[in-house]
Design a protein with these regions (language model features):
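Structural detector for internal amphipathic alpha-helices that build alpha-solenoid repeat scaffolds
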Residues: 8, 15-29, 40, 48-60, ...
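Residue-level detector of solvent-exposed, low-hydrophobicity positions
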Residues: 13, 35, 56, 63, ...
Length: 157
């Protein structure tokens, strides 16, 4: 199917579960032309459609590694969180290895959803970096949190 044929089938909003199920039922690679649209739907907070798509992407693994790398590289911590907590845990170790560079970048960039810590955890779990590197970043994050906590305490006075 073409993108033009697939777009009308896409979920209409964040709660259109029937629409999400319909597009997912078409399967991959049929839905490849609207992959970007599906990834964009995953940005919405508290969305059953986003969760359903994230779960489905978990079953696709290596077929969508490049698409997920692009999505993880964006500045949207919501989509990152959904991919790190719903999609990636369904992948095999070999499939997760494809995201090593992207996960390492996320691990060094704190955000509102603590995706950096999630990425560090995945990196450690699948041995994607040297333990020395992980410990160095963990120590750095603790130091920064300590400084932030002191500033927050000053604001509370």
């Amino acid at each position: 199917m073409t993108r033009k044929e697939l777009v009308p089938i896409l979920p209409k909003n964040a709660h259109d579960v029937a629409g999400a199920e319909k597009i997912i039922a078409l399967g991959y690679p049929t839905i490849a032309p609207v992959m970007r649209d599906l990834l964009n739907l995953m940005r919405v907070y508290n969305s059953p459609v986003a969760d359903l798509i994230a779960e489905y992407f978990g079953s696709l693994g290596r077929f969508i590694a490049d698409d997920l790398t692009k999505a993880l590289s964006k500045e949207n911590c919501g989509i990152r969180h959904r991919i790190l907590t719903i999609t990636i845990p369904r992948w095999s170790a070999i499939e997760i290895e494809q995201l090593q560079i992207c996960l390492s970048c996320i691990a060094t960039q704190p955000d509102a959803n603590d995706n950096d810590i999630l990425a560090l955890s995945i990196i450690q779990q699948f041995n994607l970096a040297e333990e020395k590197w992980i410990k160095k970043w963990t120590a750095f994050k603790r130091e920064r949190w300590s400084a932030r906590n002191m500033k927050l305490k000053q604001l509370e006075k």
